[in-house]
């Protein structure tokens, strides 16, 4: 997910998406520990996407104060 797409999302959508992606990330890590994924780089990409979304949420929080 690109930064521009993240900035277009509403705050509520971002919160929901972060929760969903975090659950997906945790499941992916568990599955990878049991049997290797075809593309383990997906874990890294997902972790960074979650970080981008959390960063945008934090920026919005600081700008609203």
Swiss-Prot record:
Keywords of this entry: Ribonucleoprotein, Ribosomal protein
One GO-annotated biological process of the protein: translation
Organism domain of life: Bacteria
GO MF assignments: structural constituent of ribosome
Gene3D superfamilies: 1.10.287.310
GO cellular component: ribonucleoprotein complex; ribosome
HAMAP family in the record: Ribosomal_uL29
Family note: Belongs to the universal ribosomal protein uL29 family.
NCBIfam families hit by this protein: L29 (TIGR00012)
Protein name: Large ribosomal subunit protein uL29
């Amino acid at each position: 997910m690109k930064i521009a797409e993240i900035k277009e999302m509403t705050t509520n959508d971002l919160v929901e998406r972060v929760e969903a992606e975090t659950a997906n990330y945790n499941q992916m890590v568990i599955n990878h520990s049991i049997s290797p994924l075809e593309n383990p780089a997906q874990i890294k990409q997902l972790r960074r996407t979650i970080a981008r979304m959390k960063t945008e949420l934090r920026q919005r929080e600081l700008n609203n104060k």
